[in-house]
Regions:
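Class I SAM-dependent methyltransferase SAM/SAH-binding core
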Residues: 65-113
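A short SAM/SAH-binding and catalytic strip from SAM-dependent methyltransferases
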Residues: 121-134
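Core SAM-dependent methyltransferase catalytic element
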Residues: 188-207
């Protein structure tokens, strides 16, 4: 199954279309995922944990879910076992469960269905990116949040991802804060350095 991004007129706006099969194949066979990311200096999970801690009402947001949780790097940086993890890859779910970093971990495709309950806060660290998810899944994420729920996302600042993935057309969330750009792969020595921001979104409640 492929999930392109569309503009309001129904035109595909992204060249690299998200492929469920490709993502599953990649991550189901990636046994050294966490080791490889840390060796390349991936640090976005630490930045997102800092943003979580800085939310003024974080203690009141008791129901928290982590989308595309991988092996649980965000939960490790968060240092509390009060989050629920979801991932498309059964291998990542297995590794994350074994880590004990989440209260619970389940396999789920957010492009197909909302989460099974509503949360106060949803995090998506690494879910959105080139050849990854597009803005088309945002209605399902919004449906998984309580009224005035918060979504934290990493947002690539390279390769035109924001425009190609249809974010300028989404109506499910309003942007309320963003960090400065930061180099997300500190150990990368080849090619152009890649930068991300952490964006804070509030769910737009239906009138």
């Amino acid at each position: 199954m492929q999930y392109p991004a569309y503009d309001p007129d129904g035109n595909v706006v992204r060249n690299a279309i998200y492929s469920e099969e490709l993502i599953k194949r990649r991550y189901n066979s990636w046994h050294t995922y966490e080791e490889d990311l840390l060796n390349l200096g991936w640090c976005a999970h630490e930045k997102m944990a800092e943003v979580m801690n800085a939310l003024p009402d974080i203690e009141q947001r008791t129901d928290k879910a982590d989308l595309a949780c991988g092996t649980g790097l965000l939960a490790k940086a968060w240092r509390r076992q009060d989050m629920v993890g979801y991932d498309l890859s059964y291998r990542m779910v297995e590794l994350s469960r074994a880590s004990g970093r989440y209260a619970r971990v389940s396999e789920l495709n957010i492009n197909r269905t909302p989460l099974p309950k509503k949360y106060d806060l949803i995090t998506a660290c690494g879910l959105f990116g080139v050849e990854m998810a597009t803005a088309i899944c945002l209605p399902n994420i919004a449906a998984s949040l309580k009224d005035d729920g918060i979504l934290l996302t990493t947002m690539p600042q390279h390769q035109g991802y924001y425009d190609e993935a249809g974010w300028q057309f989404q109506t499910s969330f309003e942007l309320i804060d963003e960090t400065e750009e930061f180099q997300s792969w500190l150990g990368e020595t080849s090619g152009t350095p890649k930068y991300h921001k952490i964006l804070t979104w509030r769910k737009v409640n239906e009138q």
